[in-house]
């Protein structure tokens, strides 16, 4: 499960918003919002976000067991 709080934090740190990341992973903003809500992304989407957002420790965000 994705730690959406950490992901939102990184998006904000980069000066972006969720619409920017939706474009980055080639999805509509609506689809991205739904994926954030469910906390599920496929491997291609994860790789695009890791690269595009320059995420140093992706396991901390995308393979979180505790998302509190």
Outline where the language-model segments fall.
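Short alpha-helical DNA-recognition segment
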Residues: 15-31
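Short C-terminal boundary/hinge segments that cap the last helix of small helical domains
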Residues: 54-68
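Key DNA-contacting residues within the recognition helix of helix-turn-helix
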Residues: 8, 33-34, 62
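Alpha-helical residues within the helix-turn-helix
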Residues: 12, 23, 51
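Residues that mark the N-terminal boundary/hinge immediately upstream of a DNA-recognition element
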Residues: 6, 17, 42-45, 57
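DNA major-groove recognition helix of helix-turn-helix
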Residues: 11, 36-37
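A short, Lys/Arg-rich alpha-helix, primarily the initiator
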Residues: 1-20
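Short, basic-rich loop-to-helix N-cap that marks the start of a DNA-contacting helix
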Residues: 38-51
């Amino acid at each position: 499960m994705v730690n959406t709080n950490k992901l939102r934090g990184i998006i904000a740190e980069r000066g972006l918003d969720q619409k920017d990341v939706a474009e980055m992973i080639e999805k509509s903003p609506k689809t991205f919002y739904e994926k954030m809500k469910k906390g599920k992304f496929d491997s291609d989407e994860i790789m695009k976000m890791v690269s595009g957002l320059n995420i140093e420790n992706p396991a901390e965000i995308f393979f979180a067991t505790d998302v509190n």
